[in-house]
């Protein structure tokens, strides 16, 4: 009986975490995403460029990139050196430019249509699970839970996982989060990690989850 009671309390704690995050950061996954894009292809490219780069800087770059090359066909035909020049501010510019050009060519071969399933997305050049989950949840509004460094950190601090493996964390969270809330949870954890639960100096005093968090630092 005690085990069942403990399990019920933990379930209620997790549901309350979801509720408070949704109250603090309202909106759909598309509304919560801070990357700027006009269609699934542009989000795919922006997400590739966002690796180890801020969304703000990516948006500055993609405004220029997409004004010149708004579609997969246009970007696939772009001069590689010109693409490298444009994406330079995002870091790792040669690798990112190469991936962007390859994925653009692959999407262009599909008639400009970005696939909407994990199986098909991860077959595209330079696309892993995190990028695929962003596209699935944000562009298509389907269940998907991107796991970045913020999601890893907050999931561990909140006692939602003991793992540091993004794939395992994704599976653990998806095992109890309602599918329709999965993308929103990921983005809310990311926003909370950027604004409150920072890596080095978490602001526990102003955190709406402090009383639910086993890692909270007492004031």
Predicted features and spans:
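Catalytic cores of DNA base-excision repair glycosylases
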Residues: 2-219
């Amino acid at each position: 009986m005690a085990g069942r009671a403990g399990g019920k309390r933990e379930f209620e704690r997790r549901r309350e975490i979801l509720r408070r995050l949704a109250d603090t950061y309202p909106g759909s996954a598309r509304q919560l995403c801070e990357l700027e894009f006009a269609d699934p292809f542009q989000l795919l490219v922006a997400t590739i460029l966002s690796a180890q780069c801020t969304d703000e800087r990516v948006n500055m770059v993609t405004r220029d990139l997409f004004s010149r090359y708004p579609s997969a066909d246009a970007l696939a035909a772009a001069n590689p050196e010109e693409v490298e020049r444009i994406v330079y501010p995002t870091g790792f510019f040669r690798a990112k430019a190469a991936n962007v050009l390859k994925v653009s060519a692959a999407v262009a071969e599909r008639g400009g249509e970005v696939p909407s399933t994990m199986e098909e997305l991860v077959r595209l050049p330079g696309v892993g699970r995190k990028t695929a989950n962003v596209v699935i949840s944000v562009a298509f509004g389907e269940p998907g839970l991107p796991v970045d460094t913020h999601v890893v950190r907050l999931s561990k601090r909140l006692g939602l996982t003991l793992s540091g493996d993004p794939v395992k964390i994704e599976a653990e969270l998806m095992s109890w989060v309602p599918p329709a809330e999965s993308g929103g949870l990921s983005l809310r954890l990311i926003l909370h990690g950027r604004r409150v639960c920072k890596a080095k100096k978490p602001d526990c005093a102003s955190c709406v989850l402090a009383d639910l968090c086993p890692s909270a630092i007492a004031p």
